[in-house]
């Protein structure tokens, strides 16, 4: 491995370009090439970024590439990620990890077999107020946690693109935006074992995709979590509350707000306000990825984390169709978790 980690960026859309610029700006990484199924888009991106454009297959097979960032439509995640892992490349794949659990499972199994690292891109873990919440919970600031509830969404701005194509995306608002908070719920509370939920197409003409869905999750120790994910959230973006025996945490990212509020049962409150800080979540997430690869540790969220978020979203879809609760944690998940831990140490 050279002094700098050498990257290929596959996918030159909005997120792909954002990731490519982050690679260029980092002192310990180099952008070797970009690729896209639209070759003209790749050429234009390469010109703007001062790098080389190649085909997807060449980017995967290049010997001078250590890591690959995949920012393509969900449908093409497995066909891009698995060959890259098979080549021994460390892979960063945008959330959601896949359209469905079966595809996500194939990707995680490929990572375990290859012993290369698979990371799910999920920058909300690196929001400063989310990081503060994690710190406060680790310090038992709330006492024993009782439940979590939250919502996430936007006004459906992305629906003029492939996001409204069921074959390309695999699911609607709950899989897309919801996977962010599903990941954070697991990060804060542990494994979800069962869920019940409902989905609906309330406003946008995108059926069979949903523009609103709500799920209730039961976690391994009996805690409950509620999530509403929406593409009709006009005052976007995210809000979450965590209640414990001794108090509560409110994580507020509505519009330009970025705060974490710690409240106690005696009525006292402490507000941590990050609203005036420049957004850094993408930079912090990428920096942690680089440090993890250098240290030989699994970057987080892992591929397994990404799989679990997809399973949780799929569980809500199945529950909405059947009218029954959906199990989320069984022997297959336990065996895969153990194999993933053995392969990655995470």
What are these regions (language model features)?
Residues 1-4, 67-70, 113, 291-346:
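C-terminal helix-rich "cap/oligomerization" subdomain common to oxidoreductases
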Residues 1-49, 345:
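N-terminal Rossmann-like dinucleotide-binding module
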Residues 19, 51-110:
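Beta-loop-alpha module in the N-terminal Rossmann-like domain of NAD(P)-dependent dehydrogenases
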Residues 33, 67, 147:
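Short, Asp-centered acidic motifs that coordinate Mg2+ and/or phosphate
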Residues 117, 124-207, 323:
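Predominantly a Rossmann-like dinucleotide-binding segment in NAD(P)-dependent oxidoreductases
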Residues 183-257, 283-297, 316, 331-346:
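Contiguous beta-strand/loop segments that form the cofactor/metal-binding neighborhood of enzyme cores
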Residues 275-286, 301:
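Active-site loop of classical SDR/Rossmann-like NAD(P)-dependent oxidoreductases
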């Amino acid at each position: 491995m050279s002094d700098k980690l050498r990257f290929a960026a596959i996918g030159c859309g909005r997120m792909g370009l954002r990731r490519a610029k982050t690679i260029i700006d980092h002192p310990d990484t180099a952008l070797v090439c970009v690729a896209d199924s639209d070759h003209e888009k790749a050429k234009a991106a390469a010109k703007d970024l001062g790098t080389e454009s190649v085909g997807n297959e060449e980017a995967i097979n290049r010997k001078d590439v250590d890591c690959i960032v995949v920012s393509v439509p969900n449908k093409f995640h497995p066909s891009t990620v698995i060959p890259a892992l098979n080549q021994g490349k460390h892979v960063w794949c945008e959330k959601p990890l896949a359209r469905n659990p079966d595809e996500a499972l194939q990707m995680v199994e490929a990572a375990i077999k290859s012993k290369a690292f698979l990371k799910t891109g999920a920058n909300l873990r690196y929001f400063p107020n989310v990081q503060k919440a994690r710190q406060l919970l680790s310090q038992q600031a709330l006492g024993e946690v009782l439940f979590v509830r939250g919502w996430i969404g936007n006004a459906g701005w992305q629906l003029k693109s492939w996001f409204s194509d069921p074959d390309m995306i695999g699911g609607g608002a709950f899989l897309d935006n919801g996977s962010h908070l599903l990941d954070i719920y697991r990060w804060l509370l542990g494994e979800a074992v069962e869920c019940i939920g409902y989905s609906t197409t309330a406003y946008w003409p995108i059926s069979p995709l949903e523009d609103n869905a709500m799920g209730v999750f039961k976690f391994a120790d009996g805690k409950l979590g509620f999530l509403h994910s929406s593409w009709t959230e006009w005052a976007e973006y995210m809000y979450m509350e965590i209640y414990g025996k001794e108090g509560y945490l409110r994580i507020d990212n509505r519009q330009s707000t970025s705060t974490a509020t710690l409240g106690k049962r005696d009525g006292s409150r402490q507000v941590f306000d990050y609203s005036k800080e420049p957004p850094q979540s993408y930079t912090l997430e990428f920096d942690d990825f680089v440090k993890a690869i250098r240290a030989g540790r699994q970057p987080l969220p892992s591929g397994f984390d990404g799989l679990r978020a997809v399973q949780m979203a799929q569980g809500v879809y199945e529950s909405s169709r059947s009218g029954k609760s959906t199990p989320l944690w069984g022997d297959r998940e336990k065996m895969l978790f153990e194999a993933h831990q053995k392969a990655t140490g995470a």
